[in-house]
């Protein structure tokens, strides 16, 4: 991994993730901004991610899945959580970016011509939602594309300690090698 500076951020990369470190974006009611740095839980530090969104990033309960996103408080059914964000790429830009790998593990289709790629950690915490395939559980969140953004909504109540799980769709599950 190599480091470089980018707009006041520290950046390190590996083959599928670009790790970006920035200052937490939380601003208190008195106008003071949190001084903590964040690399994983953008735009907030881990403390403010728990406080604002009611979730935290930690090792997934699904073998081989890497990191997952977990509730730290009760989240009712039919609640908007946050957007799935990242680089907005045309299909040709996406194809060029993943020519060697064949697919983007953090990519989601916004529309037939635009793909959101959350390969950078500053794309936000939605990138840590794992697929329910292989978990023995059912999805508890879903992706909803408005055509301008992809929103994450709960589809059943989520209790503290529950991992947020979504249906990635057949094409992605096959690309990940989870089904044939």
What are the residue ranges of the model-derived segments?
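Intrinsic disorder
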Residues: 18, 28, 39, 69, ...
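Acidic, Ser/Thr-rich intrinsically disordered and amphipathic helical segments
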Residues: 33, 44, 74, 80, ...
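Cys/His-rich Zn2+-coordinating "finger/knuckle" modules used by eukaryotic regulatory proteins
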Residues: 21-51
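Catalytic cores of histone-lysine modification enzymes
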Residues: 52-136, 179-180
């Amino acid at each position: 991994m190599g480091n470089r500076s980018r707009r006041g951020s520290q950046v390190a990369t590996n083959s599928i993730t670009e790790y970006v470190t920035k200052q937490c974006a939380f601003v208190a009611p008195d106008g003071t901004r949190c001084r903590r740095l964040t690399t994983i839980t953008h735009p907030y530090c881990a403390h403010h991610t728990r406080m604002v969104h009611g979730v935290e990033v930690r090792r997934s309960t699904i073998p081989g899945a890497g990191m997952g996103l977990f509730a730290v408080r009760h989240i009712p059914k039919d609640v908007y959580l946050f957007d799935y964000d990242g680089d907005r790429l045309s299909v040709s830009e996406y194809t060029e970016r993943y020519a060697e790998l064949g697919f983007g593990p953090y990519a989601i289709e916004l529309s037939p011509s635009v793909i959101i790629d959350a390969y950078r950690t500053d794309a936000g915490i939605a990138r840590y939602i794992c697929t329910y395939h292989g978990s023995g559980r059912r999805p508890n969140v879903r992706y909803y594309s408005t055509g301008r953004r992809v929103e994450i909504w709960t589809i059943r109540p989520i209790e503290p300690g529950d991992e947020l799980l979504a249906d990635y769709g057949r094409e992605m599950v096959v690309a990940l090698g989870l089904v044939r």
